[in-house]
């Protein structure tokens, strides 16, 4: 399909989002609207919209691609998804009640109230680092596809593609913030979910499969193995590692992440927020299973038609991230190509827009103390918030350009590797603040501990086969990271004096 035609559909899509942004923010664009949507969001709208935020372009492209990669991933990712589901239940049962009880805007205020100001800013800084990297990775994923299949043929350089993407996001988020994003993410989730089912339909149609035949083709293929239970020590795909990693990555990347928790905190009350979480979890598991099914069908189709996995332009090695766009845009074309591109755009921008808003919120609340500023006028605060919003947009641009210069790994592996190192300290900090309330931590030592823990984890991971008799870490390394942070805080803390005793 012509790049111009694809681009015209994408432009139309963003014009729709900008119109929605105008309609949702014309009555109010103050900071209360931007940060917490006036705490008036409907739980079922939040639940559905969060699907698009949680899945992102990572799921849309890389998960189907990983099904048939040379490492033999197959459906092993579903083990991780089951761990995610367990993690969501933990978040709903433990963290949400805490956040609502404390009536928070930024969830990192929990750390400030229990451990101290330095610990508070350390937690927020680790979130800013984690979310900046995560948002940049996700936007990078869609940008390289847009570049390869649309902008390269137009002679547009990669850096300009990123600038255009960020300007579009900024255009529909800078006024309404979270209130706008809750609505736009719901619309984007509609496009995302529709594109999954339509992709399955188009692939099945090309293979002359009905639903039953497609199910049996996937089941009988060598792509559909879910549970890996052999070689616990050396197998990264072992169920225990994937399941535990899924739980703790969810706690870190969801429950301790301002982005996704900000949406939950916009619900009217705790009960609504918990209904939102439980509904979201069920849909999340089902949608991921469909994404894996898309992957299996893509490889079945590719094998039948003799389609090779496209090569990376830099490394000249097969890159599974490109298989889905290659088939959708160069082999199916027409309506399937448009469906794919809109689905990919929705998946990625639903994540990036809310990430940008959460970064702005955290910086404004945790560092600039907007909620405690009683002297500045509302217009002054809004102007300052807008500058912060622009600043993070520029930062994400720079990080993406850096990724483009050095990245040659699978995006899925890279994003969760980053999460393992940056969210571990958050887990340790929150765990200590919740379960070591009878101890006073040396507040100034917190940043050092939170930096040392990931460094130690890096070396533990690198030399694990030597240190632990051949053991190979997977996503469960985040548990070790959090535990090291907890132990470090324990070492630099002391028991609180008993009241009434000198």
Protein language model features and the residues they cover:
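Membrane-embedded helix-loop-helix hairpins and adjacent transmembrane boundary segments
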Residues: 1-502
């Amino acid at each position: 399909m012509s790049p111009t035609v694809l681009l015209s559909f994408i432009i139309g899509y963003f014009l729709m989002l900008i119109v929605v942004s105008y309609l949702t923010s014309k009555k109010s664009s103050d900071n209360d609207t931007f940060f917490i949507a006036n705490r008036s969001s409907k739980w079922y709208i939040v639940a559905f919209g969060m699907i698009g935020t949680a899945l992102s372009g990572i799921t849309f492209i890389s998960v189907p691609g990983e099904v048939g990669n040379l490492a033999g991933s197959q459906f092993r990712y579903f083990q991780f998804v089951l761990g995610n589901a367990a993690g969501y239940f933990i978040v709903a049962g433990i963290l949400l009640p805490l956040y609502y009880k404390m009536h928070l805007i930024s969830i990192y205020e929990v750390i400030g109230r229990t451990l101290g100001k330095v610990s508070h800013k350390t937690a927020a800084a680790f979130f800013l680092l984690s979310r900046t990297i995560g948002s940049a990775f996700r936007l990078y994923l869609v940008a390289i596809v847009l570049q390869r299949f649309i902008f390269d043929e137009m002679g547009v350089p990669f850096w300009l593609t990123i600038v255009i993407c960020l300007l579009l996001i900024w255009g529909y988020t800078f006024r309404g913030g979270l209130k706008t994003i809750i609505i736009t993410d719901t619309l984007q989730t509609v496009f995302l979910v529709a594109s999954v089912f339509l992709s399955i339909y188009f692939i099945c149609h090309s293979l002359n499969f009905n639903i039953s035949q497609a199910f049996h083709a996937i089941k009988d293929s060598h792509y559909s193995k879910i549970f890996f239970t052999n070689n616990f020590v050396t197998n990264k795909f072992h169920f225990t590692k994937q399941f535990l990693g899924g739980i703790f990555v969810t706690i870190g990347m969801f429950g301790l992440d301002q982005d996704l928790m900000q949406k939950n905190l916009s619900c009217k009350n705790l009960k609504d927020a918990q209904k939102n979480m439980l509904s979201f979890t069920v849909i999340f598991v089902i949608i991921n299973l469909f994404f894996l099914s898309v992957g299996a069908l893509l490889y079945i189709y590719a094998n039948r038609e003799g389609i090779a996995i496209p090569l990376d332009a830099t490394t000249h090695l097969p890159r599974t991230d490109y298989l889905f766009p290659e088939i959708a845009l160069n082999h199916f074309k027409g309506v399937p190509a448009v469906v794919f591109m809109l689905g990919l755009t929705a998946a990625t921008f639903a994540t990036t827009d809310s990430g940008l808003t959460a970064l702005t919120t955290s910086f404004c609340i945790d560092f600039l103390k907007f909620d405690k500023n009683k002297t500045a006028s509302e217009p002054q605060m809004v102007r300052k918030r807008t500058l912060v919003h622009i600043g993070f947009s520029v930062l994400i641009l720079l990080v993406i350009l850096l990724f483009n210069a050095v990245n040659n790994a699978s995006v899925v592996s890279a994003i969760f590797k980053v999460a393992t190192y940056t969210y571990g300290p958050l887990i340790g900090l929150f765990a200590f603040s919740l379960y070591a309330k009878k101890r006073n931590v040396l507040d100034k030592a917190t940043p050092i501990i939170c930096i040392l823990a990931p460094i130690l984890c890096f070396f533990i991971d690198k030399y694990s086969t030597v240190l632990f008799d051949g053991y190979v870490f997977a996503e469960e390394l985040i548990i070790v990271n959090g535990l090291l942070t907890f132990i470090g805080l324990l070492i630099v803390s002391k028991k609180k004096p008993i009241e009434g005793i000198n």
